[in-house]
């Protein structure tokens, strides 16, 4: 196909394995080290990439405190072969942070503000718990319900509004785990995972290159025994149908097509369009619907044109209404989260946007599809989406 010189392309995309956030494999590895590992991997895997030519490192991270504070993008970049002359910034759009990093790089290249960016994100939810240091303004309750900050309750509400029952959620959760486990067993994640040294359950140093959050024996019977965790009396959302707390990092090398040509690189995909949208905070999980609609409109596409989809599975009760209203529910078996999703792999907040883009590009290559969509919801009522066209 014919590309324009200023088209934005992805030349490589990688991630760490997703580790548990409680006594996990990365319990002795800091967030900066995980970030540095995936940044450096892009150069190790692509000899033609020149670290000194990076225009900026843009890194997503949500809870920017403790080891994730003070511009973790820069703190991680200086631990790689990227020279000190290359700047770095950390961005925060909660769950959508690292996808927003991609969008910023895309916009900058379109505007002529550079040609080559390293983007991605990280979250170490074991070292830096999700609620550590959070201090919400009490006055905000005059404008949004306090429960809107409780993601599980927003999923309960969205599920009830769309008539999503417990059995449907349980089946969705089991599917995620079973598909992720099959992908692990068959090596489908091998091309995207960068091995990082960590520790196994016995404390021995190991190269961690397999996702450890997946429930290998997930089944409907056991899933049905789990109790609701957010609304114990009348709820339907359980730990088995919620994204797991986890630890991980992911990174993409993004540049203009003319720069890729000059470097003799074959891009994986072109960034076709992007979208970001808001929705009511009480149903924050619905955000992917308007965000995807924006991205599709910008590209002049319809949802039926999209062949492969990665939807971040914050909750089954949230994902199912999104898929229904996007017209994807009946296409799940051949198009959506074919290697499972965040329910099985976990949702390390600042990492997830880049992670689902990375997995999407990997699945598109394996399935030999052309157009793909990565989209996710964002706490307090937002959604973000990116449409890709596979090039090789």
From Swiss-Prot:
Belongs to the thiolase-like superfamily. Thiolase family. This is 3-ketoacyl-CoA thiolase. It comes from Chromohalobacter salexigens (strain ATCC BAA-138 / DSM 3043 / CIP 106854 / NCIMB 13768 / 1H11). It is an enzyme of class 2 (transferase). It is found in: Cytoplasm. SUPFAM superfamilies: Thiolase-like. InterPro entries: FadA, Thiolase, Thiolase-like, Thiolase-like_sf_Thiolase, Thiolase_acyl_enz_int_AS, Thiolase_AS, Thiolase_C, Thiolase_CS. It holds the Pfam family Thiolase_C. One of its GO terms (molecular function) is acetyl-CoA C-acyltransferase activity. Pathway: Lipid metabolism; fatty acid beta-oxidation. Heterotetramer of two alpha chains (FadB) and two beta chains (FadA). It catalyses: an acyl-CoA + acetyl-CoA = a 3-oxoacyl-CoA + CoA. GO terms for biological process: fatty acid beta-oxidation; phenylacetate catabolic process. It comes from the Bacteria. The active site is at residues 95, 347, 377.
